[in-house]
């Protein structure tokens, strides 16, 4: 059973790590399939310093949606046109009024994603040793729990900022479209890690319960072992007084025994 649990843990951990790697690599190349992953596509025509009339925000920056040839890239690149393009002219009003909201949501989401990937990858490597060492499960539970918390934070923050940005462009009369592939991969990674956490947590509880039951049965077996002393009618009191025959009701039997013996003696004398 432990081998089965470990196999499924590795399967879902590998899925989480792979999906997060796809998320991190989104927008890093103009070639298929990485050019299909983006958070938001929006109409940026007329905005100064925008890479194109139709721009796409990826994990690393904002690019020309047509061919990803013209990009503005950087670590923790926010979905905030005012910070991206260095101007407020023709920028949707909500981006200007709530600049800090878009800026910090995006940057914290970036950091949370990398932390979640690090903990998930480390848990995957260590969990391979779970086939040999039982104590590994406790270490893996800790790593997966931390990774799950940061991945939940990343998915929540990124979803929030993407939806807010889409609504901001829509309210300004501009086209905006959420990248379903990137969003789906992000939430699929969270689902895989959550399933992995539930499996390993359930397996640990099951093993602990089995050990507890075995320990209780062992203790009960020690207390229920029979003693070597006298039991029942074999006590010292019973053995001290050997059973006696009832002398009152054996007179007739003794009479016939005596008469029989006398008859045998008379025959011998004759």
Curated annotation (Swiss-Prot):
Disrupted-gene phenotype: Leads to defective tolerance to cell wall stress and antifungal agents targeting cell wall components, defective plasma membrane structure, defective endocytosis, impaired lipase secretion, SAP2 over-production, increased adherence, aberrant biofilm formation, defective macrophage killing, and decreased virulence in a mouse infection model.
An annotated GO cellular component of this protein is: extracellular vesicle
Subcellular localization, per the record? Cell membrane
InterPro entries linked? SUR7/Rim9-like_fungi
Q: Where is this region: Disordered?
A: 220-253
Which segments does the topology annotation call Cytoplasmic?
129-134, 206-270
**Which ranges does the record mark as transmembrane?**
108-128, 135-155, 185-205
According to the UniProt entry, where is the signal peptide? 1-27
Q: Which domain of life is it from?
A: Eukaryota
Keyword entries, A-Z? Cell membrane, Cell wall biogenesis/degradation, Endocytosis, Glycoprotein, Membrane, Phosphoprotein, Signal, Stress response, Transmembrane, Transmembrane helix, Virulence
- Residues bearing attached sugar chains per UniProt: 53
Q: What induces it?
A: Induced by fluconazole and down-regulated in absence of GOA1.
Query: What membrane topology does the UniProt entry give?
Result: Multi-pass membrane protein
Provide the membrane-side ranges marked Extracellular in the record.
Answer: 28-107, 156-184
Q: Name one GO biological process term.
A: cellular response to neutral pH
Q: Which family does it belong to?
A: Belongs to the SUR7 family.
Q: What role is this protein assigned?
A: Involved in cell wall, plasma membrane, and cytoskeletal organization. Plays a role in endocytosis and hyphal morphogenesis. Required to restrict septin proteins to the bud neck and prevents intracellular growth of cell wall. Contributes to secretion, biofilm formation, and macrophage killing. Essential for resistance to stressful conditions and for invasive growth and virulence.
Record-given protein name: Protein SUR7
Q: State the taxonomy lineage.
A: Eukaryota, Fungi, Dikarya, Ascomycota, Saccharomycotina
């Amino acid at each position: 059973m432990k081998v089965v649990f470990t196999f499924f843990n590795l399967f879902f951990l590998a899925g989480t790590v792979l999906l997060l790697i796809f998320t991190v690599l989104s927008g890093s190349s103009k070639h298929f399939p990485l050019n299909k992953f983006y958070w938001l596509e929006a109409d940026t025509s007329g905005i100064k310093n925008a890479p194109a009339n139709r721009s796409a925000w990826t994990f690393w920056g904002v690019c020309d949606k047509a061919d990803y040839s013209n990009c503005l890239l950087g670590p923790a690149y926010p979905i905030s046109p005012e910070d991206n393009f260095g101007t407020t002219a023709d920028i949707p009003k909500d981006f200007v009024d709530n600049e800090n909201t878009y800026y910090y949501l995006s940057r914290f989401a970036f950091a949370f994603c990398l932390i979640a990937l690090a903990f998930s990858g480390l848990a995957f490597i260590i969990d391979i040793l779970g086939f040999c060492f039982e104590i590994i499960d406790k270490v893996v539970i800790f790593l997966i729990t931390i990774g799950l918390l940061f991945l939940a934070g990343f998915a929540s923050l990124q979803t929030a900022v993407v939806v807010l940005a889409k609504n901001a462009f829509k309210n300004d009369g501009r086209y905006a479209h959420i990248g379903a592939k990137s969003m789906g991969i992000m939430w699929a990674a969270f689902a895989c890690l959550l399933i992995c956490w539930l499996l390993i947590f359930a397996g640990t509880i099951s093993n602990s319960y089995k050990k507890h039951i075995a320990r209780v049965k062992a203790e009960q077996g020690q207390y229920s072992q029979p003693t070597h002393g006298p039991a029942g009618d074999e006590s010292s009191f019973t053995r001290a007084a050997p059973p006696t025959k009832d002398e009152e009701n054996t007179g007739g039997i003794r009479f016939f025994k005596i008469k029989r013996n006398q008859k045998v003696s008379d025959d011998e004398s004759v």
